[in-house]
Amino acid sequence: DTLVAQEKTTSLNQVVNTLKERISLAGYAQLGYTYDDAVKPDNTFDIKRIIFMAHGKITKRWTCDFMYDFYNGGMLLEVYTDYQFLPGLTARIGEFKVPYTIENELSPTTVELINCYSQSVCYLAGVSGSDKCYGMTSGRDIGMMLHGKLFHDFLQYKVAVMNGQGLNTKDKNSQKDVVGNLMVYPLEWL
C-alpha cells in the first residue's frame, strides 16, 4: 500500500511539474484618473483594463495563447495558436493583434501612458472606435499569419490574411484583408 501511495504521489508531482513547465498565467490591471477642465468637468477615477493571459506550450514548436479582459462585462481579446515550421517561419491562426503599425502590437504595459496609442493608430487600426465604419476592434481581428525573424533577428516580417471585421466578429463577406509589416533592426539596441 505504501509503495502504491508513493507511486501515485510521484505521478501526481510529475503531472503538476509538467503543467508548471508548459503553462504560464499572467495578468494586470490598469487604473486611471481623468481630469477635465471643461465648464462641467467630469473628473473621475476609472478602470481601463483588467487582463488575464495564459500561454501554453503544447510541444517544442507548437504553442497556444489566450487573453481575456474582465473589465466592463468581459471580452475575449486574443485566442490563437502558433506552429513553428522552421526557424524564422511560424504560422499563427486565431484572433490576434493586426500586424499594422508598430504601436498597435505594443502592450499597454510597455507604453508609459494608459491611453497609449496615437490618434492615427487608433483610427487606422480600429483601436478606439473613432472610425464609425470600422468600429471598436481593439486592433484585433481573426485570421492567419506567417511571421518570423531572419538573419540573427536583423529582419522581422509578418504577413496576415484577416477577415477585416475586427474583434470577435465573424466575416460578413468573402473578401479578406491582407496586412503585413517588415521591420529592420540594424543595431541590437534599436
Predicted regions and their residues:
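Cleavable N-terminal export/targeting peptides
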Residues: 1-10
